[in-house]
Amino acid sequence: MSVSIFGSAKANSATKALLLGSGELGKEVAIELQRFGIEVIAADSYENAPAMQVAHSSHVVSMLDGEKLATIIRAEKPDFIIPEVEAIATDTLLALEAEGFNVVPTARAAKLTMDREGIRRLAAETLGIKTSPYIFADSKEEYLSAIEKIGKPCVIKPVMSSSGKGQSIVKSAADLDNAWTYSQVGGRSGEGRIIIEGFVPFDYEITLLTVNAVDGTHFCDPIGHRQENGDYRESWQPQAMSTVALQKAQNIAKKIVTELGGYGLFGMEFFVKGDQVYFSEVSPRPHDTGLVTLVSQDASEFALHVRAILGFPIGRIIQYGPCASSVILGNGLSDDIKFTNLDQALGSVAGAQIRLFAKPDINGQRRLGVAIARGETVEEAVDNAKTVSNKVNIIY
């Protein structure tokens, strides 16, 4: 479904977008939608989620409750349904799409990428794309058998999780029990199916933001990132890589987004070893490592996603040179989070920016914001971003 006439928010003819998931990435998407006068409805499983704070209205609902989701969607009648998390009742989205609702980029893309199994089988088994070796397991017995076949070291992940939750590396027999237990408590849907991946020696990881739009497929410059406990801590753009490796990554990305279909931005993750490229994962939405694009490009990943969704051309994406993001990571227990020393943080690096996500609470580790900075080199940009993020004090 395409929209050619755009109404104004809250008017009788308003063009509406419903966000399914309202975290920090959804918040930036909501802001970009509002730049075009779109009425934004934000939904998530908890109150006062970041995107709800900048939306016109909101709903608190489990994304896995298909019946309640369908009730909200039929009542709101959005022009665009925009999934912003993996764990959604995708069968409901498929049914609603068949009724004529517009799921971004497609309901099939949401279903295939809601867990690691659908997209891994599509990439490796249907499209013949190079990935790490893998086996899926439903029980501890299957898990142990899979490790015998895959070998050590290997990576254990719930099929449905994000930000490193439930993920660990098995290096020896001493890690087996803890890795299994963690995989069963860390996933978005609790106990269940996991993937055991053979460890791929790599030089670096990249995110290749890929935009499928009315004027074709477009690529942002590759983004490098550092992970800790399966979650990103810093990202930078551009990541240096060989012409051969970049072309391989772009070819794979185009193959996958073409298969998934629809308009929008896709966060493609790859491992790179020399000129060899291994597909890892894809999300049909903005990627957390892409927060760096808030300063590194003329149009951020969020702006690109919205422009593609609305059916607008992308044209040329302009990259401004070495830029980096550094996570402001909280670790505590509070439902009244406060920040200090922001003046010192912003004053420590010329041109630096801070985004605080305004998450309503914290219990353990949680990403609460990000610092973004430029530099003469990527290394300097990363150092600058870390300098800023490290100066932010969090009060729990």
Swiss-Prot record:
Disulfide bridges in this chain: none
Q: Name one GO cellular component term.
A: cytosol
**Alphabetically, which GO biological process terms does the record hold?**
'de novo' IMP biosynthetic process
Q: Where is the signal peptide?
A: none
Q: Does the keyword Zinc apply?
A: no
For binding N(1)-(5-phospho-beta-D-ribosyl)glycinamide, which residues are annotated in this chain's numbering? 24-25, 84, 288, 359, 366-367
| Record field: catalytic activity | N(1)-(5-phospho-beta-D-ribosyl)glycinamide + formate + ATP = N(2)-formyl-N(1)-(5-phospho-beta-D-ribosyl)glycinamide + ADP + phosphate + H(+)
Q: Tell me its EC number(s), please.
A: 6.3.1.21
For this protein, the record's InterPro entries field holds: ATP-grasp (IPR011761), ATP-grasp_carboxylate-amine (IPR003135), ATP_grasp_subdomain_1 (IPR013815), PreATP-grasp_dom_sf (IPR016185), PurT (IPR005862), PurT/PurK_preATP-grasp (IPR054350), PurT_C (IPR048740), Rudment_hybrid_motif (IPR011054)
**Molecular functions per Gene Ontology:** ATP binding; magnesium ion binding; phosphoribosylglycinamide formyltransferase 2 activity; phosphoribosylglycinamide formyltransferase activity
Q: Which UniProt keywords apply?
A: ATP-binding, Ligase, Magnesium, Metal-binding, Nucleotide-binding, Purine biosynthesis
* Positions of Mg(2+) binding: 269, 281
Q: In which pathway does it act?
A: Purine metabolism; IMP biosynthesis via de novo pathway; N(2)-formyl-N(1)-(5-phospho-D-ribosyl)glycinamide from N(1)-(5-phospho-D-ribosyl)glycinamide (formate route): step 1/1
Show where the ATP-grasp domain sits: 121-310
**Which residues are involved in binding ATP?**
116, 157, 162-167, 197-200, 205
- Please report which protein family the annotation says this sequence is part of: Belongs to the PurK/PurT family.
What the protein does comes down to: Involved in the de novo purine biosynthesis. Catalyzes the transfer of formate to 5-phospho-ribosyl-glycinamide (GAR), producing 5-phospho-ribosyl-N-formylglycinamide (FGAR). Formate is provided by PurU via hydrolysis of 10-formyl-tetrahydrofolate.
Subunit structure of this chain's protein: Homodimer.
Return the protein name: Formate-dependent phosphoribosylglycinamide formyltransferase
